[in-house]
């Protein structure tokens, strides 16, 4: 153990668009400084085809943005503060895997794969592997093998590890022949900084392995060779089998920073790297989550985390969620994951739709661009304000929040968004009110998924930019869920959670609960449900559910006729 007094831990949060670094005082939890850097290639739209649901990140985006963010922030610290940095923790989106060669190099870092999207990190929201996910689900339910989807909610998603590997392996012969393994982003960054990227040296995180890779101790780790070979023999012939057997909780040290990376980042060579995990899981820890608190990490999508004890769960498999994994959030507790595939992304879509004439005007009248950009940037806030001033629920359109598929309950990425109950009196603010209600209805469906299976939801916490900046939206969530909604007083809970794990790995705190007591974030305010609105939203929620049951069959896979 080292003294927490004066010690500083860094949390690295790799998001969809940018990386954030946060420096935190290990003793008092003070957020000392932060820096955000956007991924340059991603910002240009490179390697992505939205119409085909292809979203890829070049590893150089992560490296360059991370290096710039850490160096810029460290420069602002005093020399004494720099020398007191003891650890780095890492969280990332997920599942965001990439293929690696026998040296552990991500293929896109090699000249022969530098511009090949299949050699890059396949971002969480890439849905190119829908058919492969359905193959995995069919095999799990075939009776030929044990149901290896049992502990991930019973449905394997196209957003996850094996589906993406299977898709890329079949789509790209060169990548298939060059890759010997795949690695999640949250595992790769600690390995990169500690010089442990060789496949046999990688410390695989319990969080990513348990929630996305079908790893579970009851069947000895990953599914058996025969199961993967039944999907595609390349999974066991071209790739190492097993890719890994052991997994580690995030407070376990991965290693010490290499001399090269210490110099590049301006850090002491004594810095310890803790294990990686997904952003929402570490965000729950940063928010100070306790058992049976539903933590909603709200951004472009949501990830919902709930911690339960093994005695209550027993050997039950909770259906419809994104996994139940011992140690994925807090060591010794079962971490349960759920989520909505689109939350802020739905609002952004609506804003982009309404902004089309602004973009056209900017093309024809370039001198108007500053004013038009200002109008566009204020559009969502203006819509929210206009609807809040007259939140009529009598003619509120019912919207299904499946614009990016559905993650929970019961993952189905074939689903599409649906807008119903329009009339000639429906204006833009009213329709946007329908969008707000839809995201709240999706949140309630997740809560009910837990409660209907005897997993109680005793408290609800919300964190992220939308949670803090949009009280109207959060009040609707409180009314729809009919629960007090606690808003966490930080926009950086994911990075804060990563810093908490770094502090434990470095020895500044004995365990994660102790580190949470010193470092976790406070509650900023609590929103109370309005009883009158609760009744009205209950009626709308029932109509939402009716439309869900009506619409879903229309997105079932089309059976091809045999001639």
UniProtKB/Swiss-Prot annotation:
Transmembrane segments: none annotated. The keyword Kinase applies. It is an enzyme of class 2 (transferase). Keywords: Arabinose catabolism, ATP-binding, Carbohydrate metabolism, Kinase, Nucleotide-binding, Transferase. Pathway: Carbohydrate degradation; L-arabinose degradation via L-ribulose; D-xylulose 5-phosphate from L-arabinose (bacterial route): step 2/3. GO terms for biological process: L-arabinose catabolic process to xylulose 5-phosphate. Its EC number is 2.7.1.16. Pfam families: FGGY_C (PF02782). It catalyses: D-ribulose + ATP = D-ribulose 5-phosphate + ADP + H(+); L-ribulose + ATP = L-ribulose 5-phosphate + ADP + H(+). GO terms for cellular component: cytoplasm. One of its GO terms (molecular function) is ATP binding. Belongs to the ribulokinase family. HAMAP family: Ribulokinase (MF_00520). This is Ribulokinase. The gene is araB.
